[in-house]
Amino acid sequence: MTTNQQNAVVSQPQTVVVKLGTSVLTGGTLALDRAHMVELARQCAELKKQGHSVVMVSSGAIAAGREHLGYPALPNEMASKQLLAAVGQSRLIQTWESLFGIYGIKIGQMLLTRADLDDRERFLNARDTINALVANDIIPIVNENDAVATSEIKVGDNDNLSALVGILCGADKLLLLTDQKGLFTADPRKDPNAELIKEVKTIDDTLRKIAGGSGTTLGTGGMATKLQAADIARRAGIEVIIAAGSAPNVIFDSLSTEPQGTRFLPCSEALENRKRWILAGPAASGDIIIDDGAVNAVVGKGSSLLAKGVIKVSGDFARGEVARVTNSHGKLVARGISAYSSEDLAKITGKHSKDIISILGHDYGSEVIHRDDLVVIQE
C-alpha cells in the first residue's frame, strides 16, 4: 500500500460489508482459491487494524462442496445444489476461520433465509446478533442457508442478501466483488469499446438494460442482480461499490476517495429503520396497481395511497402484509404495508375513502397504505 493510498482513506471508523461471489473465491476454477482468499482476509484485517468494522457475505459453499466430494457428476437440480451446499458450508467456514486466524481475527457464522427477514421480530433479532458480533471484534461471515432454502438458490441470492445485511448492520459501504472491474457501458467480454462507468447517481432503466443477465455456472449472480442490490442499499443510505475481486488492495481502497470499480452514491435522504425493513425485509405478497394521478401523489408529493387511485389488485395478501405498488404499465413505484387485505382492497378500488365503511362494513382508515408505511422506489 502506498502513502498516497493511506492518505486517501477516510479516517472516521466505518462499517463495510464485503460480498464475495463464487467467481472471486474460485478464480474461475472449480475449487476455492485459498491463496487469493488469504489475500482477501489480509485486506479485511488491514481495515480492522485501521479501526473499521467488516462484515463478510461469502458465497462458495456449493463450490467447496463439489471440491470436497471430488467433483461428482450430479443432476442439475435443486436437491443436488442443496447437497453440495450442505457439504460445502462447513468446509467454507473452516477455510475462512483458518485464514483469518493468521491475523488473530475471530469469525462468527450466520446463515440466513428469507424467512429471517420477512418477520419483523426475526429481522431485529438478526440485526442484534450481527451487531453483537461486530461490537465484540468478531467478523460475521454471512451466507444464505442454501441447504434448506428452496427459493434462495436463484439469480441474485447473495447479491441481494448483502444489501439486506448492509441494512441489518447499518453499514456505511457495501463492496460487491466480482470477476468484472465494475459496471460498463456494454459487456466488456463482447464489446472492446465498452467503458467503465466510474460513478452512478441514479439507477434507471438504461442502466438496468446495460447490466443484462445471469452469472456463472458455479455462482448464481450476475451484473443485473448486483444492480438490484445496489439500488436497495443506496436507498437505505449505503454507498455501493462494484469492483474486481482480483484487483490489488480492492477492499482497502473501498474507503478511499477514489475507489476502484463503479461507485453508486447513496440517496440523499436515508430511510428510517422501519422503512428500511419495509424495503429490505419482507417479500411482497401481491401487487397494487395504481393510476397516474396516484403515482404523482405518492412519488411527487410523498402522499399516502388512497383507494381512489387503485386500479387493480393482484396476488393474495392479508392486512398488515407488504405489497408492491406498480403503475399501470407494471413498473414498480413503491413497497408498503397495506392497511387492507387484497380481498377487501379489490372491493374498494377506485372508491372514495368516505365510502369504504359502507362497502366493507368496517374501516381501517382512509389510507390503503399510509405514507409512514410506504417506501417510494421510483425516482
Swiss-Prot record:
Q: Where mainly located?
A: cytoplasm
Claim: Nucleotide-binding is one of the keywords in the record = yes
- A GO biological-process term: L-proline biosynthetic process
Q: Which residues bind ATP?
A: K19, T178, D179, T220, G221, G222, M223, A224, T225, K226
Q: Which GO terms describe its molecular function?
A: ATP binding; glutamate 5-kinase activity; RNA binding
Q: What is its EC number?
A: 2.7.2.11
Q: Which CDD domains match?
A: AAK_G5K_ProB, PUA_G5K
GO annotation, cellular component aspect: cytosol
Give the location in the cell. Answer: Cytoplasm
> Which positions fall inside the PUA domain?
285-363
- Catalytic activity field: L-glutamate + ATP = L-glutamyl 5-phosphate + ADP
At which positions is substrate bound?
A: S59, D146, N158
Query: Which keywords are on file for this protein?
Result: Amino-acid biosynthesis, ATP-binding, Cytoplasm, Kinase, Nucleotide-binding, Proline biosynthesis, Transferase
User: Pathway, per UniProt?
Assistant: Amino-acid biosynthesis; L-proline biosynthesis; L-glutamate 5-semialdehyde from L-glutamate: step 1/2
The function of this protein is: Catalyzes the transfer of a phosphate group to glutamate to form L-glutamate 5-phosphate.
Family assignment from sequence similarity: Belongs to the glutamate 5-kinase family.
Q: NCBIfam families this protein is in?
A: proB
State the protein's name.
Glutamate 5-kinase
Organism listed in the record: Vibrio parahaemolyticus serotype O3:K6 (strain RIMD 2210633)
